């Protein structure tokens, strides 16, 4: 029987500027709202692949909240742990691409419904039904989210469940009080670690990748996957190293690609796939994600990933 995957964290909508520029200081055309939030994108990808999936979060009793609930339910995610808060607003993020490819964001998360998450009886019951916990670093940056996420980690690992961890550390949250302690606490229990690029150096004393990987393996992390964006990805464990090359795609919107990659890798990893197989499908999931505007719009089914790999490898 497949393990049921739980994540905890922010749910919001994303609204995307259709022109490139630096920020939102003038009226401009926008598209959206799109369902979003790194944990929500991750768990939606898990659900799309048919792996049992669930999320604990909090949304407002508004159209933005319902938009997210409808998408997650349609993609097979257990939403019994999502509290719908009357009189509160669902979080939002406005995104605009700069000419150099970087992004400008305006967030409303901390003061949205998600920012007031607490441990509810429904959330506690959901924790008891899950065998694997996935932590996003963003969920450790707000007190309510962090408390619930760490409680889920404690309960699931105490029963022998497994833990995956994607730091997903945006620059604007790195100085959050208590974040470093929370990150270290989660890493100490992690079975599968999924940093992007140079994030791995935030967790080690090493100054080169091989030494950083060795340090983490020596500390008890079983599997490490380094996401390299358009440079592919690498898996490391005690048995060695596996690399996959990037897939060639037409990038439209990279937001959410790393979350889709992570969701696909965790799904295949939990199913017992070899590192090479899990990397291939995760790579395809990330590549598919960048072809759609909207961070959750590119979450793919197994058939869609098979087709993409068939085109790329055939």
Language-model features, listed with the residues they occupy:
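Glycine-rich phosphate/adenosyl-contacting loop at the front of the ribokinase-like
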Residues: 1-78, 252
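Conserved phosphate-binding/catalytic region of the ribokinase-like
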Residues: 1-6, 154-155, 205-314
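Structural motif
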Residues: 4, 13, 131-132, 192
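Short, conserved phosphate/pyrophosphate- and ester-handling motifs at nucleotide-, phospho-/glycolipid
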Residues: 46, 196, 258
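Conserved N-terminal subdomain of the carbohydrate kinase-like
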Residues: 52-135, 306-314
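Conserved beta-alpha-beta core of the PfkB/ribokinase-like small-molecule kinase fold
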Residues: 132, 138-215, 231-233
């Amino acid at each position: 029987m497949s393990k049921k995957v739980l994540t905890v964290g922010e749910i919001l909508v994303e609204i995307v500027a259709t022109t490139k520029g630096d920020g939102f200081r003038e009226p401009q055309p926008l598209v959206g709202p799109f369902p979003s939030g790194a944990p929500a994108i991750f768990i939606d990808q898990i659900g799309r692949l048919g792996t049992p999936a669930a999320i604990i979060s909090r949304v407002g009793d508004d159209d933005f909240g319902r938009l997210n609930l409808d998408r997650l339910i349609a993609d097979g995610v257990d939403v019994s742990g999502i509290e719908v808060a009357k009189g509160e607003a669902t979080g939002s993020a406005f995104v605009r691409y700069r000419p150099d490819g970087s992004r400008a964001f305006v967030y409303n998360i901390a003061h949205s419904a998600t920012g007031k998450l607490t441990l509810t009886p429904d959330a506690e019951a959901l924790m008891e039904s899950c065998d694997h916990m996935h932590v996003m670093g963003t969920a450790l940056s707000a007190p309510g989210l962090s408390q619930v996420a760490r409680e889920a980690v404690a309960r699931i690992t105490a029963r022998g469940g497994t833990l995956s961890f994607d730091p997903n550390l945006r620059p604007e949250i790195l100085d959050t009080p208590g974040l470093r302690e929370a990150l270290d606490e989660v890493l100490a229990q992690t079975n599968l670690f999924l940093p992007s690029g140079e994030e791995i150096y935030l967790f080690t004393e090493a100054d080169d990748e091989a030494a950083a990987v060795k340090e983490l393996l020596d500390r008890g992390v079983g599997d490490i996957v380094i996401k390299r964006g358009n440079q592919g990805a690498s898996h490391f464990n005690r048995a060695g190293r596996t690399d996959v090359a990037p897939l060639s795609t037409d990038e439209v919107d990279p937001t959410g690609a790393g979350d889709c990659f992570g969701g696909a890798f965790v799904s295949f990893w939990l199913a017992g796939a070899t590192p090479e197989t899990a990397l291939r499908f995760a790579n395809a999931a990330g590549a598919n994600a960048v072809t759609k505007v909207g961070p959750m719009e590119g979450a793919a089914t197994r058939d869609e990933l098979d087709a993409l790999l068939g085109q790329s490898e055939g």
